[in-house]
From Swiss-Prot:
This is Probable transcriptional regulatory protein MAV_3481. Signal peptide: none annotated. The lineage of its organism: Bacteria, Bacillati, Actinomycetota, Actinomycetes, Mycobacteriales. GO terms for cellular component: cytosol. NCBIfam families: PRK00110.1, PRK12378.1, YebC/PmpR family DNA-binding transcriptional regulator. One of its GO terms (molecular function) is DNA binding. It is found in: Cytoplasm. One of its GO terms (biological process) is regulation of DNA-templated transcription. InterPro entries: Integrase-like_N (IPR017856), TACO1_YebC-like_2nd/3rd_dom (IPR048300), TACO1_YebC_N (IPR049083), Transcrip_reg_TACO1-like (IPR002876), Transcrip_reg_TACO1-like_dom3 (IPR026564), YebC-like (IPR029072). HAMAP family: Transcrip_reg_TACO1 (MF_00693). Keywords: Cytoplasm, DNA-binding, Transcription, Transcription regulation. The keyword DNA-binding applies.
């Protein structure tokens, strides 16, 4: 359905406002540092690091900050934190499933902040596995239209493992298995098509349709979670119509 993104309403990637710019930069920097630590500091041999750097550049993170994060992660420069990835599960109002991915150097602080945000905004924590089974790990690549058609994108990425191409109005989203993420991104580059981001995330198998009131409650909870410096990403299985999402974001 044109203009409607299952991925975007799942992940709730709203337009970044100035007040959140610092938090966004910090999250992107942490991604670079962790990617360099896990897979090495050479982007040419570490696709995850390459994509993290490209995403940071697209978001206008200064090159000096990017390079310092890469060096810290690779051990070329002192000062890197011991980042740990932790996933919490829970329910938002209206029975909406929530996955919260944290990247933190303090597990107790992260757990406390997530719990407080959930409790104060009508959410409840859930046991591990009780929510995650509703989601599948997927790769998603986004690119601007720039005069391209859906057929142009399909022709470039179909043989690379793309499962689905969604028309979002001004851009396209390409869904694939996480293991095909590099192949899909590379296929776009080989076809001369610029991409905005390439990352792995979660896509729901079942969604919960929401009206305006329900959508506001869920988005309020998501905003509270994303206010934590330890929270990297929040995914839900909420199905929010485009017109309602637009009203909330105004």
């Amino acid at each position: 359905m044109s203009g409607h993104s299952k991925w975007a309403t799942t992940k709730h990637k709203k337009a970044v406002i100035d007040a959140r710019r610092g938090k966004m930069f910090a999250r992107l920097i942490k991604n670079i540092e962790v990617a360099a630590r896990v897979g090495g500091g050479d982007p040419a041999g570490n696709p995850t690091l390459y994509d993290a750097i490209q995403k940071a550049k697209k978001s206008s993170v200064p090159n000096e900050n990017i390079e310092r994060a890469r060096k810290r992660g690779a051990g070329e420069e002192a000062g890197g934190a011991d980042w740990q990835t932790i996933t919490y599960e829970g329910y938002a109002p209206n029975g909406v499933a929530v996955l919260i991915e944290c990247l933190t150097d303090n597990r107790n602080r992260a757990a406390s902040e997530v719990r407080v945000a959930m409790t104060r905004n009508g959410g409840t924590m859930a046991d591990p596995g009780s929510v995650s089974y509703l989601f599948s790990r997927k790769g998603v690549v986004t690119c601007e239209k720039n005069g391209l058609t859906e057929d142009d994108i399909l022709a470039a990425v179909l043989d690379a493992g793309a499962e689905e191409v969604e028309d979002l109005g001004d851009s396209f989203e390409i869904i694939c298995e996480p293991t095909d993420l590099v192949a899909v991104r590379t296929a776009l580059q080989d076809a001369g098509i610029d991409y905005d981001s390439a990352e792995a995330g979660f896509q729901p198998s079942v969604t919960v349709p929401l009206d305006a009131d329900g959508a506001q409650k869920v988005m309020r909870l998501v905003d509270a979670l994303e206010d934590s410096d330890d929270v990297q990403d929040v995914w839900t299985n909420a199905d929010i119509p485009d017109e309602i999402l637009a009203q909330i974001e105004e």
